[in-house]
Design a protein with these regions (language model features):
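Glycine-rich loop-to-alpha-helix module at the N-terminal edge of alpha/beta enzyme cores
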Residues: 40-82
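Active-site-adjacent loop/helix segments that line or gate small-molecule/cofactor pockets in enzymes
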Residues: 1-29, 71
């Protein structure tokens, strides 16, 4: 898909509560993200979603994968061992 196709699909199906950049991100690695048109960007916005480790850090991916195999989410009504 292209950036424009992703944006058009989003506009048709997602509530828009704030303005957005006209970029559709496909993947990230380290501090860089790539859009669906293959253009690479340096991510200076990680504080918005608290993504301070960058993208696809191997240790983070392994830890999340292991946790998802046990319990990916539960309400804070319950106790769990992180």
């Amino acid at each position: 898909m292209t950036n424009q196709q992703i944006i058009e699909r989003d506009n048709a199906h997602v509530a828009h509560t704030y303005g957005r950049n006209q970029i559709a991100l496909e993947q990230g690695k380290g501090m860089h993200v790539t859009d669906f048109d293959g253009k690479e960007y340096l991510d200076f916005t990680s504080g918005i979603g608290v993504n301070s480790l960058g993208y696809c850090d191997p240790d983070w991916v392994a830890a999340v994968s292991e946790q998802a195999g046990r319990l990916q989410h539960t309400s804070n009504l319950y106790y769990t061992d992180p």
